[in-house]
A protein has these predicted regions:
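Short, glycine-/small-residue-enriched flexible loop/hinge segments at domain edges that mediate gating
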Residues: 31-52, 76
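Aromatic/hydrophobic pocket-lining residues that form π-stacking "cages" and hydrophobic walls in ligand
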Residues: 29, 59-62
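Conserved beta-strand core positions
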Residues: 10, 41, 71-73
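C-terminal structural segments of small proteins and small subunits
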Residues: 65-99
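STAS-typified acidic loop motif
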Residues: 2-28
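Absolute protein N-terminus
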Residues: 1-2, 100
Length: 100
């Protein structure tokens, strides 16, 4: 998993799955990387082939964290499998999902 800071945004990329095996670690690392200056998180899902309910829970947890800072979580380039999970669970109503 790669993280970098761009202005008010923490950008996260390069991870193959977000599920029960790694979701707590993912959430903890993302929260630890946020400083007082970052209020947004942008998650690049272009290499993520698998996401389960634990992964969705992690995204919702990060959403709550950013909302408390008046920010948001943006999901970028989800793979077809991940996009299907997001659509079936109606997460597109909660998150901005962008294809670049």
């Amino acid at each position: 998993m790669k993280m970098q800071i761009q202005g008010e945004t923490l950008q996260i990329s390069e991870f193959a799955e977000l599920g029960a095996a790694n979701s707590n670690d993912f959430r903890d690392k993302a929260r630890a990387a946020l400083t007082a200056a970052q209020k947004n998180i942008e998650i690049d899902l272009s290499q993520t082939m698998f996401m389960d309910s634990c992964g969705l829970g992690t995204l919702i947890s990060l959403h709550k964290t950013t909302c408390s800072r008046n920010g948001a979580v943006k999901l970028v380039n989800p793979t077809p499998n991940v996009r299907q999970v997001l659509d079936l669970t109606r997460m597109h109503r909660l998150f901005e999902i962008v294809n670049r």
